[in-house]
Swiss-Prot record:
Keywords: Cobalamin, Cobalt, Isomerase. This is Glutamate mutase epsilon subunit. Belongs to the methylaspartate mutase GlmE subunit family. One of its GO terms (biological process) is anaerobic glutamate catabolic process. Its cofactor is adenosylcob(III)alamin. It catalyses: (2S,3S)-3-methyl-L-aspartate = L-glutamate. Catalyzes the carbon skeleton rearrangement of L-glutamate to L-threo-3-methylaspartate ((2S,3S)-3-methylaspartate). Adenosylcob(III)alamin binds at G69, N122, P179, F296, K325, E329, I333. The keyword Endoplasmic reticulum does not apply.
Length: 454
């Protein structure tokens, strides 16, 4: 079937569903869609992700959410019970094997974790645990729960997660393929995520609002806002077509105050612009700001400065929520205690800037207009390549270098502006403008500075 941005028919969905449920043994326990609907309908409002986001936006508050996930269900429950005392929203981060549909290896990881008495996986293998165990998780906790992963083919994971009572689902056919996988075609991952979005849309049609969040940071470090914005908007459009009504678009911190504030503000405005111009008016839109996703210094005091800076920018920019980091980022997967430290530092800063939104100023306004011009140039080309179809256009845009590198269709005046900025930096640093500048910038924060000057 040729890829198109078109709502899946009931027959198409049900035929595919039967194949999906057979991909692992726990699929047989979620065959009854109505059972999942009834379970979701019984979830109290204070545990529903979309309502928490809607309330936060209305009140002008920024919610906090960590990342967290371990192999064994009892340990995962205890971890999240600890974290929920300090955060507004809870995650369940999925392990690397599940992200690649390698459920046999995830099962081995569970066995080794039991034997070792500690997690041997970097997340929770939801598919292996199945719906009964996951319902025990969602019933025990008192905060809204989201699945966070990195899965190109997340269809079975989506089915089990929704039937288990999770009320938000992160990812998309672009953001969970290009940064994460090298053997999955974009055409396949977009089509697989149309299935995921249609599943969420079916819950919506039964009165259950599931929040969907494209993954904003992509590869994690120093992504130009116009690239991440374009992909977030594309994935939002794809989800809306499948009847999803709650969309959270995201962005990863780059470190420049004016650019980060402008990015969050322009992201919301551009998403509304494109969603509505293509006929989608019945939806809820929120934003997420990811604290610095690059390298961290080993010194905890320095790490706290980075965390606090990210929280301040998230709050002042008006982001609906912030994904927090821990002071142990340089060492690996953080402990619960380290995660709580990051949450507490973030909450202190969020409380302090809650009524101090960043004021309009020429520098931010200029950056907003620059980002908008760049995004419009790219998205207009994507639609052109697809003859009006954003799904087909996206595949062709990556092939042509429009959405990645090589042929990004920015106007000449904007290209000249960027060229002048790079040339000015090269003169200041006394070196030729090369890719080494990017490498130096990626490493700069872990060396206690923002710009990687020699």
């Amino acid at each position: 079937m040729e890829l198109r941005n078109k709502k899946l028919t009931h027959d198409e969905f049900m035929t595919e569903r039967q194949q999906v449920l057979k991909t692992w043994e726990t699929g047989k326990n979620v065959e009854n869609f109505e059972d999942g609907v009834k379970y979701q309908q019984a979830i109290p409002e204070h545990k529903r992700f979309s309502l928490a986001l809607l309330k936060a936006d209305k009140e002008g508050k920024t919610l906090s959410q960590p990342r967290a996930g371990v192999a064994l269900m009892d340990e995962h429950i205890e971890l999240l019970k600890t974290l929920q005392e300090e955060c507004d929203l809870l995650p369940s981060t999925i392990d690397a094997y599940t992200r690649l549909n390698r459920y046999e290896e995830a099962a081995v990881g569970i066995k080794k974790s039991i034997e070792a008495g500690t997690s041997k996986l970097n997340g929770l293998p939801v598919v292996n645990h199945g719906v009964a165990a996951c319902r025990r998780l969602t019933e025990t906790l008192q905060k809204p729960l989201q699945i966070r992963h990195g899965t190109p083919d997340a269809r079975l994971l989506a089915k089990i997660s929704m039937a288990s009572g999770f009320t938000s689902y992160e990812g998309g056919g672009i953001s969970y393929n290009i940064p994460y996988a090298k053997r999955v075609t974009l055409e396949k991952s977009i089509r697989d995520w149309q299935y995921c979005d249609r599943l969420m849309g079916m819950y919506e049609e039964h009165g259950i609002r599931i929040n969907r969040e494209p993954f904003g940071p992509l590869t994690g470090t120093l992504i130009p806002p116009f690239i991440s914005h374009s992909i977030a908007i594309i994935e939002g459009l794809l989800a809306l077509e499948q009847s999803v009504k709650s969309i959270t678009v995201g962005y990863g911190q780059v470190g420049s105050l004016t650019q980060d504030v402008a990015a969050i503000q322009s992201l919301r405005e551009l998403a509304h612009e494109y969603f509505q111009s293509y006929g989608y008016t019945d939806y809820e839109l929120s934003t997420v700001f990811h604290q610095w996703m690059g390298g961290f210094p080993e010194d905890e005091s320095k790490a706290f400065a980075i965390i606090s800076w990210g929280a301040a920018v998230a709050g002042m920019s008006g982001a609906t929520k912030v994904i927090t980091k821990s002071p142990h980022e340089a060492w690996g997967i953080p402990t619960a205690a380290a995660n709580i430290q990051g949450l507490k530092a973030s909450r202190q800063m969020l409380n302090m800037v809650n009524e101090q939104k960043f004021p309009p100023c020429p520098a931010v306004e200029l950056e907003i207009e620059l980002i908008k011009s760049e995004v419009r140039a790219v998205l207009n080309k994507v639609f052109e390549l697809g003859n009006g179809d954003i799904a087909r256009g996206t595949v062709l845009a990556f092939e042509a270098g429009v959405l990645e590198a090589g042929a990004v269709p920015l106007p000449k005046d904007i290209l000249d502006l960027h060229h002048d900025y790079v040339a000015e930096r090269a003169r200041c640093e006394g070196r030729q403008p090369t890719f080494q500048m990017v490498v130096d910038d990626i490493n700069a924060v872990s060396h206690s500075k923002l710009i990687g000057r020699p």
